Amino acid sequence: MRRSHEKEMMDFPDNPKQVLDEDLRNLRTLNRYLGGYRSVMRGLDRLVGAGKLSRFSLLDVGTGSGDIPARITNWAQHRGIKASIVALEPEPVTARVAAILTQKQTNPLFIPLLQRGKEGDFRRCGISVVRGDGNAPPFRAASFDFVLASQLLHHFSEEKIVALLRTWSRLARRAIIISDLVRHPIAYYGIRLVTKLFTRNVMTLTDAPLSVQRAFTMAEWCELFRRAEIGPFQVFSVFPYRVLALVSPKR
């Protein structure tokens, strides 16, 4: 199966809000049942455990609806670990969804506080949802222990991915966590079947299989990390058809 370069519907601006909201809900469902959460948490658990960390900071680039930062926050709270998370999202409508979702899914005892700063920040009980671009994140070098990109890199060309990894390597003190899809015919036909069974949302039905077509094989993912030349990396296969990569930036 050759890689597709066709853009997903989500990559275009001005999608109808109702269609986008439903698609984001569907993505949360797919993350829950098809390994999106499991992949990220496996990587984070490995890194936090290896460092015996009692606290950490994390930047989630292209956070979408913020469900993964919310899951990380709850995971950390249950282990007595203090997590400080910035969820970066360029789209204003999606950033608002993330702000609301993270407030609902984390500690309900916190009083909601909405702050709009220069970058359009939305702060919610340990998670700051910030409007910003992953190409030029508005943060200083070495601002975070970890930089996370979940199901984001497959949206870009190989050259762009290498450039993004180099940009993020300057922000991460400890590691970059990449969780994404693996291109495979079984994954493609499988997600087509699964999405047709539970939704009629045109964005989900279009983008879910296209995401698999736009993804890379395991060998191609490894080659991208080598090309970036930002430091040693470990790559793991996560069921079903996901890649988890932990990259340690050179200093």
Where are these regions (language model features)?
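Class I SAM-dependent methyltransferase Rossmann-like catalytic core
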Residues: K17-R42, L47
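Class I SAM-dependent methyltransferase SAM/SAH-binding core
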Residues: L59, S65-Q105, G126-A136
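Glycine-biased, low-complexity coil/linker segments
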Residues: R116-G120
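A conserved beta-strand element that flanks and buttresses the S-adenosyl-L-methionine
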Residues: L148
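A short, conserved alpha-helix within the catalytic core of class I
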Residues: F156-T167
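Conserved beta-strand signature within the Rossmann-like core of class I S-adenosyl-L-methionine
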Residues: A172-L181
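C-terminal alpha-helical "lid/dimerization" subdomain adjacent to the S-adenosyl-L-methionine
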Residues: L181-R226, Q234
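Core SAM-dependent methyltransferase catalytic element
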Residues: V235-R251
